[in-house]
Amino acid sequence: VICASPAGIERGAILAMRYADAAIIVTNPEVSSVRDSDRIIGMLDSKTERAENGSRIDKHLLITRYDAGRAQRGEMLSIDDVLEILSTPLLGIIPESQDVLRASNVGAPVTLSNQLSGAGRAYAEAARRLQGESVAMTVPNQKRGLFDKLFGRRAA
């Protein structure tokens, strides 16, 4: 059973995690989101029924809305920064994508509405990893223009 809970640390999230055997922590590579995720991980390790009985919850991290270019410019945290802060096994990296917004607006999962999109593939790969398959991790790369490829920097 997969139960989605609200973002942040509110009553809904606390109720959802109380009897969890496993958790997928979904975070954006932004300081406030990672900070909330860190608090949730702490609660998973202390406030759940399993934690109170001395057992650990199987935790996975899903990083969404990742943009390598923005991370490179320091506008968001890098994947390594997020992993260092949260110390949780990485399930997948979902790239920032207009396909997700379009799919959401029509009420369809991006994995069905645009299976070839980077986000659609990344979600499908994360689901396969969650089921135990060994799937190579794809890290979304910054799209580079001709001048960037030739000179190794952003074109003005």
Place the predicted regions along the sequence by residue.
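Loop/turn-to-beta-strand initiation segments
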Residues: 1-2
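Generic secondary-structure signature for well-ordered alpha-helical cores
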Residues: 46-49, 87, 96, 128-136
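NTP-binding/hydrolysis catalytic cores, primarily Walker-type P-loop NTPases
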Residues: 106-156
